[in-house]
Amino acid sequence: MLAEIKGLNEECGVFGIWGHEEAPQITYYGLHSLQHRGQEGAGIVATDGEKLTAHKGQGLITEVFQNGELSKVKGKGAIGHVRYATAGGGGYENVQPLLFRSQNNGSLALAHNGNLVNATQLKQQLENQGSIFQTSSDTEVLAHLIKRSGHFTLKDQIKNSLSMLKGAYAFLIMTETEMIVALDPNGLRPLSIGMMGDAYVVASETCAFDVVGATYLREVEPGEMLIINDEGMKSERFSMNINRSICSMEYIYFSRPDSNIDGINVHSARKNLGKMLAQESAVEADVVTGVPDSSISAAIGYAEATGIPYELGLIKNRYVGRTFIQPSQALREQGVRMKLSAVRGVVEGKRVVMVDDSIVRGTTSRRIVTMLREAGATEVHVKISSPPIAHPCFYGIDTSTHEELIASSHSVEEIRQEIGADTLSFLSVEGLLKGIGRKYDDSNCGQCLACFTGKYPTEIYQDTVLPHVKEAVLTK
């Protein structure tokens, strides 16, 4: 569904390259391919081997770099970031990469995808020790930990600092002479490494490699730190306490269909989810349609499995200005009609299966069901290609309270009545794992299922949780 309307948003995307004369330009194109991961801000920091130069701003990547600013960022290495704010707010000071300059130790740039669940505790400790924070972003915590580390080399300072962090993080760190890549011990966020000639490329999604012409090498492993400089790439471990738990929503919703995560194509996974959904809850109907864009693959899979024709029953308007999209519920509801239209010629007089990837608040689903009925659909059967999202996420998705999750307090039947569908079905957790290609009976399935099951792969600290949801979360 539409991220801006739906209220289900990912924090950001990161891209980095080392060893190319046009590193900032390539980073620009890489970030453009990751724009779906964040639209509130973008930035690029580059190094020429002696100094770091940067430009960043609020808005889309094309808005931030529109008046020749890109030509001012020069170097053979660069890291970039597109942001959706889930921690710290969306102000300019929080736009990444964050750049820290020191007369004694040189400069350091940080780009981060994820969310640190112990950031509040660490920040308080650092402030008690005299650290002064310039932003409200949890990313800045790492910079202060590095600065205060007692280790001699930057590599050891970073490894020591990373060992103190809890939560989800895919970090790109750049100095004048090297780029360092790190992924949390659970591997909650995707991060891949590739090659572009002799240059090393790192990105949140493999679709960025295709756009810039890079060749995929492998995934960055959980607990792994890569040190990339003019001498090549070296891999080290900063944690041996590994428990791979890739966010399931990356397959269901966030990532582009042409990306691969852990060797699994996102489009194929979503199509399989639709097939599993058909196995679990088929219904008699005349036409299947998907809510664009992220649900189309699942809808195709559902149609193939049931033999019901797939049709383009909903159209997305791609030219609604971003300034319209606001976080208020009233504008979010009105936004559905501006962003989506039902195709009367497809759905009129038909029993329609509407496939969507998830339900968060239920508001958008209700509006779309109403839209289909107004276009003449005689029945609307809603099929969701994921289990009910009943628990908050603290790892970088903008769902931090139970109150904003309708499945947290409503049964499936109550949700069906709320959205006005004839029937409503969610995919089971078992169906989700099988669709992605994981073993359901595996004690470590490789996926984070916390928003469905309430079982979090890391400790959840009290200050991470808003007071009115502490008790519910901390007892899981």
From Swiss-Prot:
Signal peptide: none annotated. It catalyses: 5-phospho-beta-D-ribosylamine + L-glutamate + diphosphate = 5-phospho-alpha-D-ribose 1-diphosphate + L-glutamine + H2O. GO terms for molecular function: 4 iron, 4 sulfur cluster binding; amidophosphoribosyltransferase activity; magnesium ion binding. Mg(2+) binds at residues 294, 356-357. The active site is at residue 12. Its EC number is 2.4.2.14. It holds the Pfam family GATase_6. InterPro entries: GATase_2_dom, Ntn_hydrolases_N, PRibTrfase_dom, PRTase-like, PurF, PurF_N. Catalyzes the formation of phosphoribosylamine from phosphoribosylpyrophosphate (PRPP) and glutamine. Homotetramer. This is Amidophosphoribosyltransferase. It comes from Bacillus subtilis (strain 168). The lineage of its organism: Bacteria, Bacillati, Bacillota, Bacilli, Bacillales.
